[in-house]
């Protein structure tokens, strides 16, 4: 999934 503006479940590149 592309990097979202907010980590609403998609935190794969969110450090």
UniProtKB/Swiss-Prot annotation:
Entry keywords, A to Z: Amidation, Neuropeptide, Secreted
Coiled coil start-end: none
Lineage of the organism: Eukaryota, Metazoa, Ecdysozoa, Arthropoda, Hexapoda
Function, in words: FMRFamides and FMRFamide-like peptides are neuropeptides.
Positions carrying Leucine amide: 15
GO biological process: neuropeptide signaling pathway
GO cellular component, one term: extracellular region
Domain of life: Eukaryota
Subcellular localization(s) per the UniProt record: Secreted
Protein name: Extended FMRFamide-12
Major localization class: secreted
Record family assignment: Belongs to the FARP (FMRF amide related peptide) family.
